[in-house]
């Protein structure tokens, strides 16, 4: 029961993170376009697609038959977003309003987020009765 509450809290946090982020991909896509590495084509389309996947994953975390799949999808998406974080860290001059230390902190935050996604999307363990 105690573990269930923490998992639910983690799922709420992850859902909020991706719902807000996903909506912002459509409401204000420009910042997301700006952080994309130049070697990735179709920046705006990628922003819209990733926003849609963020929204779908956030919703999927609350649908039990889809929870595991949604978790894997959000983990992959978060890992792919790391490409933008690497680009930002390698080119801090392109992002003068963001302190360099904050660009670096994004990497452990991404790792923690991936772990949270994994943990909150795993099935609950049920007690088994031995005969």
Task: Give a label for each model feature.
Residues 1-131:
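Membrane-interface extramembranous regions
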């Amino acid at each position: 029961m105690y573990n269930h509450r923490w998992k639910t809290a983690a799922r709420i946090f992850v859902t909020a993170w991706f719902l807000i982020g996903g909506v912002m991909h459509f409401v204000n896509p420009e910042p997301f376009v700006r952080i994309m590495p130049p070697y990735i084509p179709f920046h705006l389309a990628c922003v819209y697609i990733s926003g849609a996947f963020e929204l779908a994953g956030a919703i999927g975390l609350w649908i039990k038959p889809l929870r595991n799949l949604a978790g894997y999808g959000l983990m992959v998406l978060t890992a792919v977003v790391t490409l933008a974080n690497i680009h930002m860290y390698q080119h801090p001059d392109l992002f003068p309003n963001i302190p360099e230390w904050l660009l670096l902190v994004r990497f452990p935050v991404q790792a923690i987020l991936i772990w949270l996604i994994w943990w909150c999307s795993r099935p609950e363990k049920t007690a088994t009765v031995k005969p």
